[in-house]
């Protein structure tokens, strides 16, 4: 992704397993969706927010000329599941049962809330993944092992985390924000930092797929921990939302997607609900 704010496609080859990351422009929060390409099939992770980007992502997926095994939806924030309805409705969807419940319960309201702003750029209805995966289990898909975990009370209520042990990859999604400002709406700084530390401490894993921004290594996980420590300290001062934003921006002037603040300050400062 360049300073010209373009969509980016990043490809990493792990001796035959290719990971493609499709990252939205900064103005759309650098939403990161991913493809795990094995010999015969593709596995998709998340689906972008606005329909044009979701369809562009689907177009890139189809250009690989391999069948899609499934689509994983990491968590119940609309910038990760709207695109499933827009561009992958013909594909099987999988997530944790708790994530599926959140999408079913809150998804229609998210459509209602966002329609006045985005109109036809978002779907008219949500699509809830039809299948579930269980935390603590694993599955081999086209010869590659996927290990499933549930992370609760970090960036969001509950999230699917996937490890690919044979190639040392963690599909962290919104636990990690790479090069952009973090969404802090829930204010669960401490537990989020603990979960990030677990990722940092993992042996044999050093390629991280974030939910926003380009793929990264563990250095960026540590940067996220430091960012959360700074944000927590500023939040404890009891400042107004605007002053909180000014101080955090001053501390991190080089992180992109400043619009992230506008997406979460109402939640963090109690002016909006939990989603």
Residue ranges of model-derived segments:
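Basic/polar N-terminal segments that are highly enriched at the extreme N-terminus
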Residues: 1-17, 273-275
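Divalent metal-coordination and catalytic microenvironments
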Residues: 36, 46, 61, 75, ...
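Metallo-beta-lactamase
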Residues: 42, 49-51, 145, 152-225, ...
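Short catalytic-loop micro-motif centered on adjacent basic/acidic residues
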Residues: 43-46, 69-72, 147-148
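Short acidic-hydrophobic surface loop/beta-edge motif
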Residues: 12, 36, 136-142
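Conserved beta-strand hairpin/beta-sheet module of binuclear metal-dependent hydrolase folds
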Residues: 9-59, 63, 160-174
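Active-site HxH/HxHxD metal-binding segment of metal-dependent hydrolases
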Residues: 55, 59-138
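Accessory terminal helices/loops
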Residues: 2, 201-203, 214-275
């Amino acid at each position: 992704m360049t300073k010209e704010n373009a969509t980016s496609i990043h490809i990493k080859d792990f001796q035959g397993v290719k990971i493609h990351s499709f990252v939205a422009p900064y103005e759309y929060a650098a939403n990161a969706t991913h493809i795990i390409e094995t010999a015969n099939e593709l596995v998709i992770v998340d689906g972008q927010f606005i329909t044009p980007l979701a369809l562009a992502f689907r177009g890139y997926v189809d250009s690989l000329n391999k069948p899609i095994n499934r689509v994983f939806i990491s968590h119940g924030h609309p910038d990760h599941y709207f695109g499933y309805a827009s561009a992958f409705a013909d594909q099987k969807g999988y997530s944790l049962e708790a994530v599926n419940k959140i999408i079913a319960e809150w998804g229609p309201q998210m459509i209602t809330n966002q329609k006045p702003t985005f109109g036809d750029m978002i779907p008219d209805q949500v699509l809830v993944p039809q299948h579930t995966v269980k935390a603590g289990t694993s599955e081999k898909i086209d010869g590659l092992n996927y290990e499933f975990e549930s992370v609760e009370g970090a960036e969001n209520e509950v999230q699917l985390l996937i490890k690919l042990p044979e190639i040392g990859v963690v599909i962290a999604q919104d636990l990690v924000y790479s090069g952009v400002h973090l969404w802090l709406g829930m204010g669960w700084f401490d537990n989020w930092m603990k979960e990030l530390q677990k990722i940092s401490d993992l042996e044999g894993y050093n390629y991280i797929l974030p939910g926003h921004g380009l793929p990264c290594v563990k250095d960026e996980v540590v940067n996220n921990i430091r960012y959360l420590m700074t944000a927590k300290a500023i939040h404890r001062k009891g400042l107004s939302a605007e002053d909180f934003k000014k101080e955090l921006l001053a501390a991190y002037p080089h992180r992109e997607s400043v619009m992230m603040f506008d997406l979460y300050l109402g939640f963090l400062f109690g002016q909006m609900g939990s989603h």
